[in-house]
């Protein structure tokens, strides 16, 4: 049955586990055990916040290990859960990290990135609260440039109305704006660490800005361009940066969700003989231990405790097994959830049922060209059939196979849609077979195309 959006009875602790599962059902097909596990984990967070006294600090989240092939919904469940609660969410592959002392990223960067996301979330929220005030101040600065600071209130009102109506959008003005040039004299990449850089700082600029003497420069620009620059400037002035940082740290510590994908890739399979690789993998696992158990990480915003951050790890575990992880790490991921491989019925449901299903997405895209796309039930079944066949014969990538199949199926229509305005195109099983049968039957070709 198709999941629909429901208005729930207000609960003082937020959504109940059943309501969370129902919300996830709107976007994700099947995997009830995984949905139930994350729903309980989320509800327990709310329960913990209502526990009195010192006991609250002793209650830690039960971290989750999801086991299942790629494309079965592991990442999507965690991502939708974070959206549902407006929690800071950070996804990273375990293979991105190396043991401390080796070249590469260290695991503490997970928390630094999570806090950065939390700060941006809090900043966006704070800006919406002062948006009207910031716009008013921006308009006043525009008026100062247009009619001067000493102009009469009557003149300012007339020009203000014109600014609001957009009549003066293309009028050129001269206005002072913040100098956004970076502090210092450029940067250089740190050898052996791609993507990282070290800046050369200008001490005079730094001291000047620290004392509040931020630089401005006068520029000529159109009114509409000035508004786009000045509003963000005024927003930054109105929000309390220190308060935002404190709220962001609290948000990350109590509501943060970290999703570590491909954790099976750092497990040490007994059959593998590469000793150097094993040392590095085991080192990453050991570095993850304190982070998941609870430690304090230094960030540019201050110290962040990881005790109550929810960690969700996932992996396919085709070669290694969960028992190949370090025993200590296994103990810190007490909830194990195995996700099922997708069946033909699951594929059909994925194509049709979610609110943002692939069929709805493609129909909406082609619909922008005034072309009506319609899929018959037999066509949907055929697409699901082909997806399962290729997954079995080539490699099982789960629901992601549907993306490649639909792209190939609709390639000609997408290319020609702009010349087909007003037309209705019906995709039936015969159309699907004509477009894809040659590729499906030639497995060597399917490996490269699908």
UniProtKB/Swiss-Prot annotation:
Q: Where in the cell is it found?
A: Cytoplasm
Query: Which residues does the record give as ATP binding sites?
Result: 29, 71-76, 261, 328, 400
Stored SMART domains = AAA, ClpB_D2-small
Task: Output the Pfam families linked to this UniProt entry.
Answer: AAA, AAA_2
Respond yes or no to whether keyword Ubl conjugation is given for this record: no
Q: Which InterPro entries match?
A: AAA+_ATPase, ATP-dep_Clp_protease_ClpX, ATPase_AAA_core, Clp_ATPase_C, HslU, P-loop_NTPase
GO CC annotation, single? HslUV protease complex
Biological process according to GO: protein unfolding; proteolysis involved in protein catabolic process
Output the CDD domains linked to this UniProt entry.
RecA-like_HslU
Q: Name one GO molecular function term.
A: proteasome-activating activity
Free-text function comment from the UniProt entry: ATPase subunit of a proteasome-like degradation complex; this subunit has chaperone activity. The binding of ATP and its subsequent hydrolysis by HslU are essential for unfolding of protein substrates subsequently hydrolyzed by HslV. HslU recognizes the N-terminal part of its protein substrates and unfolds these before they are guided to HslV for hydrolysis.
Q: Can you state the subunit structure given in the record?
A: A double ring-shaped homohexamer of HslV is capped on each side by a ring-shaped HslU homohexamer. The assembly of the HslU/HslV complex is dependent on binding of ATP.
Question: Protein name, please?
Answer: ATP-dependent protease ATPase subunit HslU
Protein source organism: Rickettsia canadensis (strain McKiel)
Q: Which gene encodes it?
A: hslU
């Amino acid at each position: 049955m198709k999941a629909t959006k429901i208005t729930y009875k207000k609960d003082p602790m937020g959504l109940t586990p059943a309501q969370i599962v129902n919300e996830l059902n709107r976007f994700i097909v099947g995997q009830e055990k995984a949905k139930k596990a994350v729903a309980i984990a989320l509800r327990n967070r709310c329960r913990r916040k209502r526990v009195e006294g010192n006991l609250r600090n002793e209650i830690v989240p039960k971290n989750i290990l999801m086991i299942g092939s790629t494309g079965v919904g592991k990442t999507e469940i965690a991502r939708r859960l974070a959206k549902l609660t407006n929690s800071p969410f950070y996804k990273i592959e375990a293979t991105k990290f190396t043991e401390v002392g080796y070249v590469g990223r260290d695991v503490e960067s997970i928390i630094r990135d999570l806090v950065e996301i939390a700060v941006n979330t809090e900043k966006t929220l704070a800006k919406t609260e002062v948006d009207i005030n910031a716009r008013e101040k921006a308009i006043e600065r525009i008026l100062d440039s247009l009619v001067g600071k000493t102009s009469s209130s009557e003149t300012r009102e007339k020009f203000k109305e014109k600014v609001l109506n957009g009549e003066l959008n293309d009028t050129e003005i001269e206005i002072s704006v913040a100098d956004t040039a970076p502090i210092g004299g450029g940067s250089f990449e740190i050898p052996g660490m791609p993507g990282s850089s070290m800046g050369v700082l200008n001490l005079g600029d730094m001291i000047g800005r620290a004392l509040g003497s931020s630089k401005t420069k006068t520029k000529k620009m159109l009114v509409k361009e000035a508004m786009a620059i000045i509003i963000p400037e005024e927003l930054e002035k109105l929000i309390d940066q220190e308060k935002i940082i404190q709220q962001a740290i609290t948000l990350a510590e109590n509501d943060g969700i970290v999703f570590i994908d491909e954790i099976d890739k750092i497990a040490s399979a007994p059959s593998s003989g590469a000793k150097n690789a094993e040392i590095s993998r085991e080192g990453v696992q050991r570095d993850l231990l304190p982070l998941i158990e609870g430690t304090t990480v230094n960030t540019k915003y201050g110290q962040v405790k990881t005790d109550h951050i929810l960690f969700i790890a996932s992996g396919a575990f085709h070669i290694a097994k969960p028992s190949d992880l370090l025993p200590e790490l296994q103990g810190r991921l007490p909830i194990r959830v195995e996700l099922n491989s997708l069946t033909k019925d699951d594929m059909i449901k994925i194509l049709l049922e979610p609110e943002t299903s692939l069929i709805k997405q493609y129909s909406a895209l082609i619909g922008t060209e005034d072309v009506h796309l319609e899929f018959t039930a037999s066509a949907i079944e055929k697409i699901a059939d082909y997806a399962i066949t290729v997954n079995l014969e080539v490699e099982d990538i789960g629901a992601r196979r549907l993306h490649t199949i639909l792209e190939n199926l609709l390639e000609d229509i997408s290319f020609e849609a702009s010349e087909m305005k007003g037309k209705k195109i019906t995709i039936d099983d015969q159309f699907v077979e004509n477009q894809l049968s040659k590729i499906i039957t030639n497995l060597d070709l399917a490996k490269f195309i699908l």
